[in-house]
Amino acid sequence: MDRFQIGDEQLLRFYQLKTINPTHSWAQDSSKLNNEEATSNELGVETSFDILKDFKYGNQISIDKESRAYLNDESLSYIRDPLNGQEMSKELQHLPNDSMRLNYLVNSKQFNVKAFLRDMHKQDSFNDLNNSLDRLDSDIQDQSIHLKQLVGKNFTKYVKIKNKLDQIYKEFDEKTNEKNQCDSPKENQINVESLNKKVDEVIRTTTFKLKPLMDNYQKILNYQATKKFIELNKFYFNLPKSLKRCLTNNDFNEFIIEYSKGLTLRRRFNQSSDASQSLVIKRIWTQIENLLVTYKDLIWNSLINSNFNIDQPQETILSLFSKLLNLENFINNNQRESESGNKNTTSSSNENPILRWMSIKMNGFQNELNELSGHMISKIIHSQRLILQNNTNQDKSQGCVELSYYLKINQLFQIISDTGKDSEGLKSTVEPNKVNTISGTSYLNLNCQPSSQGLTDSPTIIEMWLLILKYINDLWKICDQFIEFWEHIEKFLDGTYQNSIINEKRKENILIGDSNIIESYQKSLILKEEQINEVRLKGEEFITSVSQNLISFFTSSQSSLPSSLKDSTGDITRSNKDSGSPLDYGFIPPNCNGLSCLRYLPKIVEPILKFSTELAQLNITTNGITICRNTLSTIINRCVGAISSTKLRDISNFYQLENWQVYETVTFSSKSQDSSKNLTFEYGVTQFPEIVTSFQEVSIKTTRDLLFAYEKLPIINGISVVSYPSKQLLTGIEIQQIISMEAVLEAILKNAAKDKDNPRNSHTILTLTNLQYFRECAFPNILQYFDDAFEWNLASKNLELFSLLSKMESSIFGNYLSDLKINLRDTLEEKFHEINWPMYTSNSFRVGDYIIEALMILIVVHSECFRIGPQLIHKILIETQIFIARYLFEAFKPYVGNLSNDGSLQIIVDLEFFQKVMGPLLEKDTEATLRACLQNCFQNDTNRLQKCINEINPIVSANLKRTAIQFAAFS
């Protein structure tokens, strides 16, 4: 068969022409363009270069030529991005080899659209890419028109030339075969084959050059199809951006609406079998699903982070739950209706969202509570150790306590009522005496709140108090948030919130017409009885944790407090019975004084009372109420015990505060012995009684406020956690009060013991005046204050306290008098025996020295007592004049019947002078004793005695006149 015998059909099929003699354009005469649309759907972008497989070698040659022509450094500088017109040299130079660079050149056969958009335009928005695509499409259309014009202009010439060449080739083949067929056909055939190969190569090269034109046309069709698809589904492609905008604007309703529309489009796409579109659709849907997860997380975070304060009312919680349930229901419906079983679809948790929210929140409260307790107890223990380290060089029992702050107790606790400054402000229950202080210490009103000015203890101790206070206040904040949170839980447990949400959904059901929506919501909203019980037990666990932390702290001792950090159950080992020492109370700073306890313990207990009452009144469980009651009972008892122990310790050491200076003057009124007139004295006392009185009153008030806290706490639904204190407890408080007042007397005795060898000084006088003030004023008023505070009758009882006080007065005063009498005795003996009474003679009869010096001793005593304790002068003079009279009575006995005449007269002068000097202060016993002494000296010769007294009166008067100034104090 002749290889050059080719028919017209073969030529038309090979060149894809309609006619063997084309005269018009390529678009009209080519048969390929007519079926391009039919084959375009079958051929993808990835297989577009498989049209002419036999040109593979030529393709590789073309790639090499492209690499040499366009990928050198000089050519790269001219390559520009077809979308934005910017240079691409920097981006292309970072690629490792030339073959990869060709993927990013739009005119290359290896151009990869996805890689080009992903790497070169990853920062561009959808609008930017859309505008660039429009611009590129316009450029390609312009170029395509130009190419079409060029092909159409030269196509006829090309076909004619090709036809002519074929005819020449055919004629050449025929002539050559006829001429050389017999001679040497084999060699001639080789030449023909060579020529055939050359012609085929020319045809192949020509077709290869035409291929880019056909490829560009295919790309144009692909771009047009892509643009049309994007424009038709613009909403779907813009959906991620729209959903982000909804989240930013908190427009959650619009979010669900937009998502629903996108879900409808997604289902429609799933029904389509176009594989080329599925990848892009899946990627966009993945972004949408991620935004849905973000929306769900946003709702959860809003619920979890809710503080439930006044800024977040009930409507907000319901709104968040409504949105969450909408989303859960939407996801569930989506899963049921999904036919593709897409694993990437957001899944809804099978757990009830309400129970899950409650569990997460309560676990959060529990963790926050444990973290707070561990952190703050650790800091409190560290502060405790610092205090102990600072006091290692001091007396562990007493010396480390700062008592100097008691000197400013009235500035630290301004509790004195202004109405108490009148004469009726202070009244003793001991009649008929009435006492009031000039400077003013008055009855404390229970409603009076002490003001806090200045430090009550050393800075290191105050620092620990503040840490404890911060711990309790932070605990209060957590409990307060839990209480507000539980109020919302209670409305879920009793169905209030569920009814509100379901009613809202019913309204939506009327508008939407979805009959299944109510049933689907009820499954998520309705809680079973066992679920409700589990929630309540979870709430009880929180109350138990709070109680354990408080009990662990308030039942610790100074030595066991560090171990409370390790013990999470609150079972701190301690002795069954407190020793009464401040060391038994680890919740107060070591060596803190009573003032700081009185200031900070009420501040610490008050928040505990409030949040414990509110926790109990939530009525979570019956056991929860019992736990709160037991916890408060323990805390109150421990705080009262701490106040009592520190008060007793400090009062026992109050003697250290005595400075022996008159602090104030007290007016004392009493009846004369014959009750004929009122005697008024003013005596001075030190600051010691006022410190004791103020401290006692503040202690009583603070203790009373703690024990009677129920008066200030509300009772809701019949639930109260603090009740009226028991009689046993009040009896214990009464005993502690009496013990503390006895400790005052012990402190006074400690100072008095220092002067027992030299009692005649101002310290003894001030001690006696202080004791008198305690007996007549301070103690009665303290007892009356106690009775008013606790509705008790302590003041009416016959307490041994006052007997002990009187014995102390008598003992100290007796010691003072004993020393004075010894001094008088020594003086009298010395001067009395200097006179030779049997041989005594005198011309002037001046008062004897023994009388003058004895009276001078009394003058000194008068001077000592007059400013500090004038009420003591009378008692001292009574005792001393009787002592002097009795001493003289005994001293003159040996001389009875053995006195000279002048000696007898001298005795009359001395004794009459002594009586005249004493004047109104002269006691009848003294006068009778001295009269008996004179009668003994005159051997009971009363006539002679009276005659001598009358005769000697002028001499006595002269002596009185001469010593009037010297002894004016007695007049």
Curated annotation (Swiss-Prot):
The keyword Calcium is assigned to this record: no
Residue ranges with Low complexity bias: 558-567
UniProt keywords, alphabetically: Coiled coil, Exocytosis, Phosphoprotein, Protein transport, Transport
Gene Ontology CC annotations of this record: cell periphery; cellular bud neck; cellular bud tip; exocyst; incipient cellular bud site; mating projection tip; prospore membrane
Coiled-coil ranges (or none): 123-182
Location of region: Disordered: 558-577
Pfam families documented for this protein: Sec5
Nucleus found in the keyword field: no
Function: Component of the exocyst complex involved in the docking of exocytic vesicles with fusion sites on the plasma membrane.
Family indicated by similarity: Belongs to the SEC5 family.
Name listed for the protein in its UniProt record: Exocyst complex component SEC5
Annotated source species: Saccharomyces cerevisiae (strain ATCC 204508 / S288c) (Baker's yeast)
Primary gene name: SEC5
